Amino acid sequence: MELKVTTLEGKEAGSVQLSDEIFGLDPRVDIIQRCVNWQLAKRQAGTHKAKGRAEVWRTGKKMYKQKGTGGARHGSQRVPQFRGGGRAFGPVVRSHAFDLPKKVRALALKHALSAKAKDGGLIVIESATLEAAKTKALVGHFSGLGLTSALIIDGAELNNGFAVAARNIPNIDVLPIQGINVYDILRRQKLVLTKAAVDALEARFK
């Protein structure tokens, strides 16, 4: 697959050949969904907690005598049916994370990249560098490229000027190649890769 390369200013800068094994797959929604669910489950705090009947503060004394009242045979006031009683099967502090094989994660990333390429949401730029960290200048560049919602992936190290300038622009995310992931690719309309990012991806999946 061949794709045009543009500069940050919107000028043409040749073309790049993309591997069909990474960008030319027929997207599998089920594999992508598995990876997104894995990511979202892994980042859940899991700090939810409700007190059970063993944890609430209530007296342990029997409420009233066993017989002769005409009422139910209650003992503890800590049971769930009473106000102030413990919650039955309430949430506990736990990890929501589950395992997903590394090969499935790698495949999901390929399918997410292929989905963006298929939908026309993939853009390759020559480099993501700015001499001065000026947000106004970067907004102008993005406007020229038609970017309102985008994930920008650079090489192993981000250009400091570019990263700082992009930090305050809504719906724009900037990540190094090590941080590329399925969820962030899907949550933005466009995926912008630098030539360094393309080379790193092809080296990673070689």
From Swiss-Prot:
Name of the protein described by the UniProt record: Large ribosomal subunit protein uL4
NCBIfam families assigned: rplD_bact
Reported function: One of the primary rRNA binding proteins, this protein initially binds near the 5'-end of the 23S rRNA. It is important during the early stages of 50S assembly. It makes multiple contacts with different domains of the 23S rRNA in the assembled 50S subunit and ribosome. Forms part of the polypeptide exit tunnel.
GO cellular component: ribonucleoprotein complex; ribosome
Domain of life assignment: Bacteria
Species lineage: Bacteria, Pseudomonadati, Pseudomonadota, Alphaproteobacteria, Hyphomicrobiales
One GO term (biological process): translation
Subunit record text: Part of the 50S ribosomal subunit.
The species this protein was found in: Rhodopseudomonas palustris (strain BisB18)
HAMAP family: Ribosomal_uL4_B
